[in-house]
């Protein structure tokens, strides 16, 4: 568990640094932590993804639903998210179950990484 918390803290620090380096409107660390919704969404996704992989999909989806209501950003617990994802003006961003988002990706509002297939196959972008 401690390793997981260290990993979470490392990802949060990396993401905050990425925002500070990328967004001139980000004037301090506390502003990023408290007012950038994607930081909150990524925090909840960290836990939801682990629950999803551990065989607890309903609880994972419930956490993801809470995150969506709070942030306006929908990240399926099955999605794989790399380090340094920056979702600027994130309202309406949707990242689907089989999507793989690499390191240091920037997304803006109203982006959907989704698919239309009802088959249980890879159906989201990588």
How should these model regions be labeled?
Residues 1-67, 71:
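Terminal amphipathic alpha-helical/low-complexity segments used for targeting or macromolecular assembly
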Residues 53-126:
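Flexible, glycine/small-residue-enriched loop-and-beta-strand segment within the central core
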């Amino acid at each position: 568990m401690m390793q997981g918390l260290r990993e979470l803290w490392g990802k949060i620090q990396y993401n905050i640094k990425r925002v500070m380096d990328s967004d001139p409107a980000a004037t301090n660390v506390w502003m990023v932590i408290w007012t950038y919704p994607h930081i909150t969404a990524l925090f909840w996704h960290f836990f939801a993804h682990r629950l999803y992989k551990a065989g607890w999909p309903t609880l994972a989806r419930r956490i993801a639903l809470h995150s969506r209501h709070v942030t306006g950003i929908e990240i399926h617990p099955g999605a794989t998210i790399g380090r340094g994802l920056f979702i600027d003006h994130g309202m309406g961003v949707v990242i689907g179950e089989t999507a793989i988002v690499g390191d240091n990706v920037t997304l803006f509002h109203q982006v959907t990484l989704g698919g239309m297939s009802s088959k249980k196959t890879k159906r989201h972008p990588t």
